[in-house]
UniProtKB/Swiss-Prot annotation:
Gene Ontology terms: cellular component: plasma membrane
Family: Belongs to the SLC13A/DASS transporter (TC 2.A.47) family. DIT1 subfamily.
Keyword Nucleotide-binding set for record: no
InterPro entries: CitT-rel, SLC13A/DASS
Regions crossing the membrane: 10-30, 33-53, 54-74, 93-113, 137-157, 189-209, 236-256, 292-312, 313-333, 340-360, 370-390, 393-413, 418-438, 465-485
Catalytic activity of the protein: (2R,3R)-tartrate(out) + succinate(in) = (2R,3R)-tartrate(in) + succinate(out)
Function of the protein: Catalyzes the uptake of tartrate in exchange for intracellular succinate. Essential for anaerobic L-tartrate fermentation.
Bilayer topology term: Multi-pass membrane protein
Alphabetical keyword list: Antiport, Cell inner membrane, Cell membrane, Membrane, Transmembrane, Transmembrane helix, Transport
Pfam families per record: Na_sulph_symp (PF00939)
Organism: Shigella boydii serotype 4 (strain Sb227)
Name of this protein: L-tartrate/succinate antiporter
Length: 487
């Protein structure tokens, strides 16, 4: 992009801030709260347009608020308190997100992903599944799903998982059967495999708390607004029936709705076997990595009463360093991990300020008045449907979550009858599952869309069909199962 032609991306967030700031302060709000909301909204616009990287947008927003904290962050009553030093208080607020346990959990999970990549364990697992299940096209779809499922708990970047590990493997499969991109032969087997790649990425992103960065952002927003939270085990158990159903149903459903011409063949297993032979036997580093990952998953699921999930991740990373699975250079040079670390911490800080200034409680009361007279169940379902469908308007899961999740949480808090843990888990699942709707919804989407095997009309049609199925199943399990295990 040329700066001269993209100047509007820089000006738009500033224009939004100015417009909101000039609007008269709504009744029930203090002026500093309204000005804070103006800057917060400008940050969200910046995250959507990305004139600079998202982490930079968030850090600039925090800097503006902290420097102007007497007018944006603190009320006159707070400033008048004896001994109140706004300089120290604004600094404490600015760095608050970096001490949040959610931040360190996702950072540790990124290091797990680095271990998978460096040892080759992730690639080996995918190749083994392809070799064992690749004789039939339907089973190959299950191999793609199971590969994503195994990698998802310890790969919080669905882009790294889908576009960095799975896609480079499965893109080699269609040409083995003369199924070429942008050609009539693409439907032979390539279209089915590529659709399975993106749909499996979306499904697994919803199954585990640590499978997608916005999941952890949501929990951070939930905690800052209500002091309630969902553990790794809570998320996993709450999603369990839906997870099992989708993992088993989706490959078959894709096989029926987007049937491949070629139903079976031996070329794929032979290719996978050749690749595995080139990798050699399971090495000691892979074995150590596998042992640590199994241990981490066990503690995440069953150890919540004894050790925090973030501490599990932190300790496992330390062991990975001691066992030389990864090096210190791998940590300091992991740009993706540090990028997510900074923008996620910054967004949690900004969301905390939205709550501290009183905007969330005001917005909740406003919604409570408009929603009175409707049943909590009806309101909850309506909010989930609206949140899900608004996915069409966002090309970033991070911007989507940052913009809409605080409003969803405020709406739920406005009606005490709505079970917040259940509602937030449904919102979290909608982030991942709703990513299937468009070819721009999440990081791997453009990769699979641009593979040449998924025509535009097919992608939008399948996205709508699968998206509707996912939404219906989410609402059903959210109402019938999640309250049983979360309340």
């Amino acid at each position: 992009m040329k700066p001269s032609t993209e100047w509007w991306r820089y000006l738009a967030p500033l224009a939004v801030i100015a417009i909101i700031a000039l609007i008269p302060v709504p009744a029930g709000l203090e002026s500093h709260t309204w000005l804070y909301f103006a800057v917060f909204t400008g940050v969200i616009v910046g995250l959507i347009l990305e004139p600079v990287p998202g982490a930079v947008v968030a850090m600039v927003g925090i800097s503006i608020i902290a420097i102007l904290s007497p007018w944006l962050l603190f009320s006159p009553e707070q400033l008048a308190q004896p001994g109140f030093k706004f300089t120290a208080k604004s600094l404490s607020w600015a760095v608050f997100g970096f001490s949040n346990s959610v931040i360190w959990l996702i950072f540790a999970a990124f290091m797990f992903g680095t271990g998978y990549e460096k040892t080759g364990l992730g690639r080996r697992i995918a190749l083994i599944l392809v070799k064992k299940m690749g004789h039939r096209t339907l089973f190959l779809g299950y191999a793609v799903m199971f590969s994503e499922l195994i990698l998802a708990p310890v790969t919080p970047s669905n882009s790294a998982r889908g576009a960095g590990i799975i896609y480079p493997i499965i893109r080699n499969l269609p040409p083995l059967y003369q199924s070429q991109p942008n050609d009539s032969s693409s439907r032979s087997i390539g279209s089915y495999i590529m659709w399975m790649g993106i749909v499996a990425d979306c499904v697994t992103s919803a199954i585990f708390l640590t499978a997608m960065a916005p999941n952890l952002l949501l929990i951070g927003l939930m905690k800052s607004a209500s002091h309630a939270t969902l553990s790794w085990g809570d998320w996993f158990l709450g999603m369990l029936p839906l997870s099992i159903l989708l993992v088993l149903l989706v490959p078959w459903l894709a096989y029926v709705l987007y049937p491949p011409v070629l139903k079976s063949g031996d070329q794929v297993p032979r290719w996978a076997e050749t690749e595995l032979q080139a990798m050699g036997p399971l090495c000691s580093r892979e074995k150590r990595m596998l042992g640590l990952m199994v241990g981490a998953l066990v503690l995440w699921i069953f150890g919540g009463d004894y050790i925090d999930a973030a501490m599990v991740g932190y300790s496992v990373v330390a062991l990975m360093l001691l066992l030389r699975i990864i090096s210190w250079d791998d940590i300091v040079s992991n740009k993706a991990a540090w990028n997510v670390f900074f923008w996620l911490a910054s967004l949690i800080t900004l969301a905390t300020g939205l709550n501290n200034t009183g905007f969330i409680s005001w917005f909740g009361k406003l919604l409570a008045g408009s929603l009175s007279g409707y049943s909590p169940t009806m309101v909850m379902v309506a909010l989930i449907v609206v949140f899900y469908l608004l996915r069409y308007f966002f090309a970033s899961a991070t911007a989507y979550t940052s913009a809409l999740a605080p409003m969803m949480i405020a709406a739920a808090l406005a009606m005490p009858e709505i079970p917040l843990p259940v509602f937030c888990l449904m919102v979290g699942a909608a982030i991942g599952l709703g990513s299937i709707l468009t070819p721009y919804a999440t990081g791997p989407s453009p990769i699979y869309y641009g593979s040449g095997y998924l025509p535009t009309a097919d992608y939008w049609r399948l996205g709508a069909i699968f998206g509707l199925i996912f939404l219906v199943l989410l609402v059903i399990t959210g109402l019938l199962w999640m309250p049983v295990v979360l309340l």
